[in-house]
Amino acid sequence: MLNKLKIGTLLLLTLTACSPNSVHSVTSNPQPASAPVQQSATQATFQQTLANLEQQYQARIGVYVWDTETGHSLSYRADERFAYASTFKALLAGAVLQSLPEKDLNRTISYSQKDLVSYSPETQKYVGKGMTIAQLCEAAVRFSDNSATNLLLKELGGVEQYQRILRQLGDNVTHTNRLEPDLNQAKPNDIRDTSTPKQMAMNLNAYLLGNTLTESQKTILWNWLDNNATGNPLIRAATPTSWKVYDKSGAGKYGVRNDIAVVRIPNRKPIVMAIMSTQFTEEAKFNNKLVEDAAKQVFHTLQLN
C-alpha cells in the first residue's frame, strides 16, 4: 500500500518566503510566492514525521500552510489531489456571499421532503417552512448539512456555475461535479470533486483574508466558521485555548478526513492551512487523530508550540 506511494520521492517540503502583499491573484488576494526548496534539518524532520504518520495511519496525507506573519509556506503533497468532501462548504458560503446581494441573505428558500438527502440535521427541521439563504449557509458550514448545501448550489446555478466562480477566483485546479452526498465517494484516481491542499487553503484565504468579499461579508463568514460544530477533534484539538480556529471539516469514503482553517493566534497575523487525507479501502474509517497529529507537527515546525 504505502510502498506504492514512493514516499521517498513524492513527499516534498517547501518553505518559502515573500511579502504577503507582494503577489496577487486575479482577484488581488495576497498569496505566497514560489521559491526553491531549502534543505534544512527542520524540513527533513518534518518530512520524516509526516512519512511516519502515513505509515502509522496507513494513509496518504496532504498539507499546505501559509503563515501570513512571516510569509513562509509549508507544504507536503500540497499539489496532489484529494477528495475535498465537506470542506468545500466554507468556500461555497463564500461564493454565495460573493455572488448574491447581501439583502438576499434574508430571502427564504422553500423546499420539500423530496429535496432532503442523507445527513440534513437542520434542513429536516424546516420542511415545508423553508430557510433563509443565511440560515442555509450557516447550516452547511456549521453543521455540514447536505441538503442545505445542495439548495445553495442550486441557488447559485448548479455545480458548473460554482466552478466558474472558483475559476474567477483564480482557482484552475478544483473540479466540482456532483451534489451531496455523491461527491464523497472519493474513489482513487477519480478527479471529480477533488482539489489540492494548496488550492483549498488559498481559496479560504481569498474569502477570509483577501479582497474578494467586503469587510461586512467577511465578518459574516468568520462568524459561521467560528461556530463550526464539527471541527473540535481536528486542527482545533492541536491548539491551545487562547488560539481561535475558523475551520471546515470534511469526511468521505476511503477514510477521507480533511480540515481547512484560518488560525488566529494572539499578537500575530493568522495562519492559513489545509490538511487532507485518504486511505486505501472504500470501507476505511476516518481518523480524527491523524489530522490532529499532522496539525501538531505543523505548529511544532513553525515553532508555535
UniProtKB/Swiss-Prot annotation:
<dbReference type="InterPro" id="IPR012338">
    <property type="entry name" value="Beta-lactam/transpept-like"/>
</dbReference>
<feature type="signal peptide">
    <location>
        <begin position="1"/>
        <end position="33"/>
    </location>
</feature>
<dbReference type="InterPro" id="IPR045155">
    <property type="entry name" value="Beta-lactam_cat"/>
</dbReference>
<keyword id="KW-0732">Signal</keyword>
<dbReference type="GO" id="GO:0008800">
    <property type="term" value="F:beta-lactamase activity"/>
</dbReference>
<keyword id="KW-0614">Plasmid</keyword>
<feature type="binding site">
    <location>
        <begin position="248"/>
        <end position="250"/>
    </location>
    <ligand>
        <name>substrate</name>
    </ligand>
</feature>
<dbReference type="InterPro" id="IPR000871">
    <property type="entry name" value="Beta-lactam_class-A"/>
</dbReference>
<keyword id="KW-0046">Antibiotic resistance</keyword>
<feature type="active site" description="Acyl-ester intermediate">
    <location>
        <position position="86"/>
    </location>
</feature>
<dbReference type="Pfam" id="PF13354">
    <property type="entry name" value="Beta-lactamase2"/>
</dbReference>
<dbReference type="InterPro" id="IPR023650">
    <property type="entry name" value="Beta-lactam_class-A_AS"/>
</dbReference>
<comment type="similarity">
    <text>Belongs to the class-A beta-lactamase family.</text>
</comment>
<dbReference type="GO" id="GO:0030655">
    <property type="term" value="P:beta-lactam antibiotic catabolic process"/>
</dbReference>
<dbReference type="GO" id="GO:0046677">
    <property type="term" value="P:response to antibiotic"/>
</dbReference>
<keyword id="KW-0378">Hydrolase</keyword>
<protein>
    <recommendedName>
        <fullName>Beta-lactamase ROB-1</fullName>
        <ecNumber>3.5.2.6</ecNumber>
    </recommendedName>
</protein>
